[in-house]
Design a protein with these regions (language model features):
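Extracytoplasmic
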Residues: 1-19, 27-90
Length: 90
C-alpha cells in the first residue's frame, strides 16, 4: 500500500491522526476549502492541511491511527476519487 509521508499543518479541521485519506490537492486554499465544504455537506468530517514545502493544500476526508482502517477508507473513496491516497503524518 502506497503511503506518502509529509509534514503538514491543519488549516481547517479537528486534527490529524497517523494516517489520513487525501482526496484532493490544490495550490489554492479557496479550492481546497471548496472541496472540504462539499465533503462536509455529504456528511464527512473533512479537513484541510497545508504542506509549506510544496505550497499545496491537502483535502483530507478521513483520518485514522490504524493503517488497515485508513486503507479500507481510501479504497471506498476511490470510487468517487480515483486518485485518493494515504498521508502519513510526519
Amino acid at each position: 500500500v502506497g503511503v506518502k509521508s509529509e509534514a503538514v499543518t491543519v488549516v481547517d479541521g479537528g486534527g490529524l491522526k497517523a494516517f489520513s485519506v487525501v482526496v484532493g490537492s490544490f495550490g489554492s486554499k479557496a479550492n481546497a476549502l471548496g472541496l472540504q465544504q462539499r465533503l462536509k455537506n455529504q456528511g464527512h468530517a473533512a479537513q484541510v492541511a497545508y504542506n509549506p514545502s510544496i505550497n499545496f493544500y491537502r483535502v483530507i476526508v478521513s483520518t485514522f491511527d490504524n493503517k488497515a482502517e485508513a486503507v479500507s477508507s481510501r479504497n471506498s473513496f476511490r470510487a468517487q476519487y480515483p486518485d485518493a491516497w494515504l498521508l502519513l503524518k510526519k
